[in-house]
Amino acid sequence: MAIDKRKNDHIYLASSEISQVGSPWFDEVILLHNALPEIDLSEVDITTRFLGVKVNAPFGIGAMTGGTELAGKINAELAKIAEEFGIPIYVGSQRVALMKPEVRWTFEVVKKNAPSVPKVANLGAPQLAELSDEKLAEWVSQAVDMIDAYAIAIHLNAAQEVIQPEGEPRFRGVFEKIKVVRKAAGRPVIVKEVGNGISKEVASRLVEVADAIDVGGYGGTSFIAIEGARAAESGSSMRRRVAEVFKSWGIPTAASICEARSGYRGYIIASGGIRSGLDGAKALALGADFFTMSQPFLKAALEGRLREEIETVIAEVKIAMFLTGSRTIEDLKSAPRVYGPRLRNWIEQRKLVC
Protein backbone atom coordinates (compact mmCIF):
# COMPACT_ATOMS: atom_id res chain seq x y z
CA MET A 1 0.00 0.00 0.00
CA ALA A 2 1.35 3.43 -0.99
CA ILE A 3 2.82 5.41 1.89
CA ASP A 4 0.72 8.50 1.06
CA LYS A 5 -2.50 6.49 1.43
CA ARG A 6 -1.22 5.09 4.73
CA LYS A 7 -0.46 8.60 6.00
CA ASN A 8 -3.91 9.88 5.01
CA ASP A 9 -5.53 6.78 6.54
CA HIS A 10 -3.79 7.64 9.79
CA ILE A 11 -5.11 11.22 9.67
CA TYR A 12 -8.74 10.23 9.16
CA LEU A 13 -8.68 7.26 11.52
CA ALA A 14 -6.85 9.18 14.28
CA SER A 15 -9.48 11.92 14.14
CA SER A 16 -12.33 9.39 14.40
CA GLU A 17 -13.80 7.57 17.36
CA ILE A 18 -12.60 4.20 16.04
CA SER A 19 -9.07 5.11 17.17
CA GLN A 20 -10.06 6.06 20.72
CA VAL A 21 -9.56 3.15 23.10
CA GLY A 22 -9.65 2.76 26.88
CA SER A 23 -9.10 5.28 29.65
CA PRO A 24 -5.97 7.26 30.55
CA TRP A 25 -7.19 7.14 34.18
CA PHE A 26 -7.45 10.88 34.70
CA ASP A 27 -10.81 10.09 36.28
CA GLU A 28 -8.70 8.38 38.97
CA VAL A 29 -7.16 11.74 39.94
CA ILE A 30 -9.22 14.25 41.91
CA LEU A 31 -7.72 17.69 42.47
CA LEU A 32 -9.12 18.99 45.74
CA HIS A 33 -11.31 22.05 45.45
CA ASN A 34 -9.98 25.05 47.34
CA ALA A 35 -12.99 27.11 48.42
CA LEU A 36 -10.72 29.93 49.61
CA PRO A 37 -7.98 30.14 46.96
CA GLU A 38 -6.74 33.61 48.05
CA ILE A 39 -5.84 34.54 44.46
CA ASP A 40 -7.70 36.17 41.59
CA LEU A 41 -8.18 34.29 38.34
CA SER A 42 -6.29 37.10 36.61
CA GLU A 43 -3.23 36.30 38.75
CA VAL A 44 -2.92 32.73 37.47
CA ASP A 45 0.29 32.41 35.46
CA ILE A 46 0.42 29.47 33.05
CA THR A 47 3.77 30.35 31.48
CA THR A 48 6.48 27.75 31.93
CA ARG A 49 9.68 26.44 30.35
CA PHE A 50 9.84 23.78 27.69
CA LEU A 51 13.27 22.18 27.97
CA GLY A 52 14.68 25.53 29.06
CA VAL A 53 12.75 27.79 26.67
CA LYS A 54 10.01 30.04 28.03
CA VAL A 55 6.61 29.28 26.48
CA ASN A 56 3.17 30.77 27.04
CA ALA A 57 1.42 27.63 28.27
CA PRO A 58 2.28 24.24 29.80
CA PHE A 59 1.13 22.35 26.73
CA GLY A 60 2.00 21.95 23.08
CA ILE A 61 0.75 20.41 19.86
CA GLY A 62 1.73 16.75 19.78
CA ALA A 63 3.17 14.69 16.93
CA MET A 64 0.68 13.95 14.19
CA THR A 65 1.38 13.94 10.51
CA GLY A 66 3.34 14.84 7.38
CA GLY A 67 4.14 13.46 3.95
CA THR A 68 0.96 14.14 1.95
CA GLU A 69 -0.78 17.22 0.57
CA LEU A 70 -3.47 16.96 3.24
CA ALA A 71 -0.83 16.54 5.94
CA GLY A 72 1.02 19.60 4.67
CA LYS A 73 -2.12 21.72 4.89
CA ILE A 74 -2.80 20.48 8.42
CA ASN A 75 0.79 21.09 9.52
CA ALA A 76 0.62 24.64 8.16
CA GLU A 77 -2.51 25.39 10.19
CA LEU A 78 -1.12 23.78 13.34
CA ALA A 79 2.11 25.75 12.98
CA LYS A 80 0.30 29.05 12.54
CA ILE A 81 -1.71 28.51 15.70
CA ALA A 82 1.38 27.38 17.64
CA GLU A 83 3.13 30.59 16.63
CA GLU A 84 0.10 32.72 17.52
CA PHE A 85 -0.19 31.26 21.02
CA GLY A 86 3.52 30.80 21.66
CA ILE A 87 3.45 27.05 22.29
CA PRO A 88 5.73 24.20 21.07
CA ILE A 89 4.81 21.94 18.17
CA TYR A 90 5.96 18.43 17.24
CA VAL A 91 5.80 17.10 13.70
CA GLY A 92 4.94 13.55 12.69
CA SER A 93 7.54 10.99 11.63
CA GLN A 94 9.88 12.56 9.07
CA ARG A 95 11.09 9.30 7.58
CA VAL A 96 8.84 9.78 4.56
CA ALA A 97 10.46 13.14 3.76
CA LEU A 98 13.95 11.72 4.14
CA MET A 99 13.12 9.02 1.62
CA LYS A 100 10.98 11.17 -0.68
CA PRO A 101 12.42 14.71 -0.95
CA GLU A 102 9.39 15.85 -2.94
CA VAL A 103 7.27 15.78 0.25
CA ARG A 104 9.71 17.71 2.44
CA TRP A 105 7.52 20.79 2.01
CA THR A 106 4.81 19.13 4.13
CA PHE A 107 7.17 19.51 7.09
CA GLU A 108 8.98 22.67 6.03
CA VAL A 109 5.70 24.60 6.31
CA VAL A 110 6.10 24.26 10.08
CA LYS A 111 9.39 26.15 9.98
CA LYS A 112 7.82 28.79 7.75
CA ASN A 113 4.67 29.30 9.81
CA ALA A 114 6.11 28.89 13.32
CA PRO A 115 9.53 30.56 13.20
CA SER A 116 9.83 31.54 16.86
CA VAL A 117 8.40 28.66 18.91
CA PRO A 118 10.20 25.42 19.87
CA LYS A 119 9.71 22.81 17.17
CA VAL A 120 10.32 19.09 17.69
CA ALA A 121 11.61 16.86 14.88
CA ASN A 122 10.59 13.21 14.87
CA LEU A 123 12.15 9.88 13.84
CA GLY A 124 11.01 6.32 14.56
CA ALA A 125 12.97 3.85 16.65
CA PRO A 126 12.70 0.90 14.22
CA GLN A 127 14.50 2.86 11.52
CA LEU A 128 17.42 3.76 13.79
CA ALA A 129 18.76 0.24 14.14
CA GLU A 130 18.90 -0.43 10.40
CA LEU A 131 21.04 2.63 9.63
CA SER A 132 24.80 2.98 9.95
CA ASP A 133 25.93 5.57 12.48
CA GLU A 134 26.99 7.85 9.62
CA LYS A 135 23.68 7.56 7.80
CA LEU A 136 21.75 8.03 11.02
CA ALA A 137 23.69 11.21 11.81
CA GLU A 138 22.85 12.43 8.30
CA TRP A 139 19.14 11.72 8.82
CA VAL A 140 19.15 13.49 12.17
CA SER A 141 20.79 16.56 10.65
CA GLN A 142 18.29 16.66 7.80
CA ALA A 143 15.29 16.15 10.08
CA VAL A 144 16.42 18.98 12.35
CA ASP A 145 17.18 21.35 9.47
CA MET A 146 13.88 20.58 7.78
CA ILE A 147 11.89 22.34 10.49
CA ASP A 148 14.64 24.26 12.30
CA ALA A 149 14.00 22.00 15.29
CA TYR A 150 14.83 22.95 18.85
CA ALA A 151 14.63 19.28 19.90
CA ILE A 152 14.23 15.88 18.29
CA ALA A 153 11.92 13.07 19.39
CA ILE A 154 12.57 9.37 18.91
CA HIS A 155 9.25 7.56 19.01
CA LEU A 156 8.96 4.05 20.40
CA ASN A 157 6.09 2.27 18.66
CA ALA A 158 6.72 -1.45 19.09
CA ALA A 159 3.03 -2.27 19.52
CA GLN A 160 2.08 -0.42 16.35
CA GLU A 161 4.83 -2.03 14.30
CA VAL A 162 3.71 -5.59 15.06
CA ILE A 163 0.18 -4.88 13.82
CA GLN A 164 0.89 -2.54 10.91
CA PRO A 165 0.88 -4.40 7.56
CA GLU A 166 4.04 -2.50 6.58
CA GLY A 167 5.44 -2.75 10.11
CA GLU A 168 9.11 -3.16 10.98
CA PRO A 169 9.23 -4.61 14.52
CA ARG A 170 13.00 -4.39 14.81
CA PHE A 171 14.18 -2.90 18.08
CA ARG A 172 17.50 -4.64 18.74
CA GLY A 173 20.21 -2.00 19.14
CA VAL A 174 17.84 0.98 19.40
CA PHE A 175 19.19 2.08 22.79
CA GLU A 176 22.73 2.48 21.44
CA LYS A 177 21.43 4.25 18.35
CA ILE A 178 19.67 6.84 20.51
CA LYS A 179 23.13 7.74 21.81
CA VAL A 180 24.17 8.38 18.21
CA VAL A 181 21.13 10.60 17.74
CA ARG A 182 21.97 12.60 20.83
CA LYS A 183 25.53 13.19 19.70
CA ALA A 184 24.51 14.07 16.14
CA ALA A 185 21.59 16.31 17.08
CA GLY A 186 23.45 18.66 19.40
CA ARG A 187 20.12 19.55 20.98
CA PRO A 188 17.62 17.98 23.40
CA VAL A 189 16.50 14.44 22.64
CA ILE A 190 13.00 13.38 23.68
CA VAL A 191 12.22 9.67 23.82
CA LYS A 192 8.49 9.14 23.49
CA GLU A 193 5.93 6.38 23.32
CA VAL A 194 2.94 6.64 21.01
CA GLY A 195 0.08 5.27 23.09
CA ASN A 196 1.26 2.34 25.21
CA GLY A 197 3.17 4.12 27.98
CA ILE A 198 6.61 3.99 29.55
CA SER A 199 7.40 1.98 32.68
CA LYS A 200 9.66 2.84 35.59
CA GLU A 201 12.23 0.34 34.38
CA VAL A 202 12.42 1.80 30.88
CA ALA A 203 12.45 5.34 32.28
CA SER A 204 15.44 4.51 34.47
CA ARG A 205 17.34 3.20 31.42
CA LEU A 206 16.55 6.37 29.49
CA VAL A 207 18.40 8.49 32.06
CA GLU A 208 21.53 7.74 30.04
CA VAL A 209 20.23 8.82 26.63
CA ALA A 210 17.24 11.15 26.95
CA ASP A 211 16.92 14.80 27.87
CA ALA A 212 13.18 14.27 28.28
CA ILE A 213 10.66 11.44 28.34
CA ASP A 214 7.24 11.75 26.71
CA VAL A 215 5.18 8.97 28.30
CA GLY A 216 2.67 8.55 25.43
CA GLY A 217 0.36 6.55 27.66
CA TYR A 218 -2.60 4.28 26.96
CA GLY A 219 -6.14 5.58 26.97
CA GLY A 220 -6.49 7.80 23.92
CA THR A 221 -5.52 7.35 20.30
CA SER A 222 -4.56 3.71 19.75
CA PHE A 223 -2.34 2.97 16.79
CA ILE A 224 -3.12 -0.69 17.38
CA ALA A 225 -6.80 0.09 16.75
CA ILE A 226 -5.88 2.22 13.73
CA GLU A 227 -3.76 -0.54 12.21
CA GLY A 228 -6.48 -3.04 13.01
CA ALA A 229 -8.97 -0.94 11.06
CA ARG A 230 -6.54 -0.70 8.15
CA ALA A 231 -6.01 -4.46 8.29
CA ALA A 232 -9.76 -5.05 8.15
CA GLU A 233 -10.02 -2.76 5.12
CA SER A 234 -7.26 -4.63 3.34
CA GLY A 235 -8.82 -8.02 4.10
CA SER A 236 -6.21 -9.22 6.63
CA SER A 237 -8.40 -11.11 9.09
CA MET A 238 -5.44 -12.31 11.17
CA ARG A 239 -4.05 -8.82 11.80
CA ARG A 240 -7.51 -7.49 12.55
CA ARG A 241 -8.04 -10.21 15.17
CA VAL A 242 -4.62 -9.65 16.75
CA ALA A 243 -5.32 -5.91 16.92
CA GLU A 244 -8.63 -6.57 18.65
CA VAL A 245 -6.87 -8.65 21.31
CA PHE A 246 -4.04 -6.17 21.91
CA LYS A 247 -5.82 -2.83 21.54
CA SER A 248 -6.15 -2.61 25.35
CA TRP A 249 -2.40 -3.23 25.83
CA GLY A 250 -0.47 -0.52 27.63
CA ILE A 251 0.06 1.60 30.72
CA PRO A 252 -2.68 4.18 31.34
CA THR A 253 -1.28 7.69 31.03
CA ALA A 254 -1.86 8.68 34.65
CA ALA A 255 -0.03 5.56 35.83
CA SER A 256 2.72 6.04 33.24
CA ILE A 257 3.44 9.55 34.54
CA CYS A 258 3.96 8.03 37.99
CA GLU A 259 6.07 5.24 36.49
CA ALA A 260 8.29 7.70 34.63
CA ARG A 261 8.64 10.05 37.58
CA SER A 262 9.68 7.11 39.77
CA GLY A 263 12.48 6.07 37.41
CA TYR A 264 13.58 9.38 35.92
CA ARG A 265 14.33 12.72 37.56
CA GLY A 266 14.56 14.69 34.32
CA TYR A 267 11.96 16.50 32.23
CA ILE A 268 8.72 14.57 31.75
CA ILE A 269 6.09 15.28 29.11
CA ALA A 270 2.62 13.78 29.48
CA SER A 271 0.62 12.66 26.46
CA GLY A 272 -1.94 10.03 25.64
CA GLY A 273 -5.67 10.58 26.07
CA ILE A 274 -5.40 14.13 27.38
CA ARG A 275 -8.66 15.61 26.19
CA SER A 276 -8.99 18.82 28.20
CA GLY A 277 -7.06 21.39 30.15
CA LEU A 278 -8.30 19.71 33.32
CA ASP A 279 -6.75 16.40 32.22
CA GLY A 280 -3.54 18.33 31.53
CA ALA A 281 -3.64 19.99 34.94
CA LYS A 282 -3.99 16.56 36.55
CA ALA A 283 -0.99 15.34 34.55
CA LEU A 284 1.08 18.24 35.85
CA ALA A 285 -0.07 17.58 39.42
CA LEU A 286 1.00 13.93 39.04
CA GLY A 287 4.54 14.98 38.20
CA ALA A 288 4.72 15.89 34.51
CA ASP A 289 6.48 19.13 33.56
CA PHE A 290 4.50 19.65 30.36
CA PHE A 291 1.78 17.98 28.32
CA THR A 292 0.85 17.64 24.67
CA MET A 293 -2.40 16.95 22.88
CA SER A 294 -2.76 15.55 19.37
CA GLN A 295 -6.16 14.10 18.50
CA PRO A 296 -8.24 17.04 19.81
CA PHE A 297 -6.16 19.51 17.81
CA LEU A 298 -6.15 17.33 14.68
CA LYS A 299 -9.93 16.98 14.84
CA ALA A 300 -10.34 20.71 15.47
CA ALA A 301 -8.06 21.54 12.53
CA LEU A 302 -10.11 19.34 10.20
CA GLU A 303 -13.31 21.00 11.46
CA GLY A 304 -12.01 24.57 11.22
CA ARG A 305 -12.13 25.36 14.95
CA LEU A 306 -8.50 25.07 16.00
CA ARG A 307 -8.21 28.51 17.64
CA GLU A 308 -11.28 27.82 19.78
CA GLU A 309 -9.81 24.48 20.89
CA ILE A 310 -6.53 26.07 22.01
CA GLU A 311 -8.35 28.88 23.81
CA THR A 312 -10.57 26.34 25.58
CA VAL A 313 -7.62 24.28 26.81
CA ILE A 314 -5.91 27.44 28.10
CA ALA A 315 -9.09 28.46 29.95
CA GLU A 316 -9.46 24.99 31.47
CA VAL A 317 -5.87 24.94 32.75
CA LYS A 318 -6.29 28.38 34.29
CA ILE A 319 -9.57 27.45 35.96
CA ALA A 320 -8.13 24.22 37.37
CA MET A 321 -5.23 26.21 38.80
CA PHE A 322 -7.52 28.89 40.24
CA LEU A 323 -9.80 26.32 41.89
CA THR A 324 -6.82 24.64 43.56
CA GLY A 325 -5.31 27.95 44.69
CA SER A 326 -2.34 27.47 42.36
CA ARG A 327 -0.91 30.74 41.03
CA THR A 328 1.91 29.04 39.09
CA ILE A 329 2.58 25.67 37.47
CA GLU A 330 4.95 24.87 40.34
CA ASP A 331 2.11 25.53 42.80
CA LEU A 332 -0.11 23.15 40.85
CA LYS A 333 2.45 20.37 41.16
CA SER A 334 1.99 20.41 44.93
CA ALA A 335 -1.80 20.80 44.89
CA PRO A 336 -3.62 18.32 47.18
CA ARG A 337 -5.13 15.40 45.30
CA VAL A 338 -6.87 12.09 45.89
CA TYR A 339 -6.37 8.93 43.83
CA GLY A 340 -9.05 6.45 42.88
CA PRO A 341 -8.69 2.73 43.73
CA ARG A 342 -7.20 1.60 40.42
CA LEU A 343 -4.44 4.21 40.35
CA ARG A 344 -3.78 3.91 44.09
CA ASN A 345 -3.48 0.13 43.77
CA TRP A 346 -1.11 0.52 40.81
CA ILE A 347 1.09 2.95 42.74
CA GLU A 348 1.21 0.64 45.75
CA GLN A 349 1.91 -2.56 43.81
CA ARG A 350 4.58 -0.92 41.70
CA LYS A 351 6.05 0.99 44.67
CA LEU A 352 5.91 4.28 42.80
CA VAL A 353 6.51 7.81 44.02
CA CYS A 354 3.58 9.90 42.90
Swiss-Prot record:
GO terms for molecular function: FMN binding; isopentenyl-diphosphate delta-isomerase activity; magnesium ion binding; NADPH binding; oxidoreductase activity. It comes from the Archaea. Signal peptide: none annotated. SUPFAM superfamilies: FMN-linked oxidoreductases. The keyword Isomerase applies. Substrate binds at R6, K7, S93, Q94, R95, Q160. Keywords: Cytoplasm, Flavoprotein, FMN, Isomerase, Isoprene biosynthesis, Magnesium, Metal-binding, NADP. Transmembrane segments: none annotated. One of its GO terms (biological process) is isoprenoid biosynthetic process. Its cofactor is FMN; NADPH; Mg(2+). GO terms for cellular component: cytoplasm. SMART domains: IMPDH (SM01240). It is found in: Cytoplasm. Its EC number is 5.3.3.2. It catalyses: isopentenyl diphosphate = dimethylallyl diphosphate. FMN binds at A63, M64, T65, S93, N122, K192, T221, G273, I274, R275, S294, Q295. The keyword Cytoplasm applies. Mg(2+) binds at E161. Involved in the biosynthesis of isoprenoids. Catalyzes the 1,3-allylic rearrangement of the homoallylic substrate isopentenyl (IPP) to its allylic isomer, dimethylallyl diphosphate (DMAPP). Belongs to the IPP isomerase type 2 family. Homooctamer. Dimer of tetramers. This is Isopentenyl-diphosphate delta-isomerase. The lineage of its organism: Archaea, Thermoproteota, Thermoprotei, Thermoproteales, Thermoproteaceae.
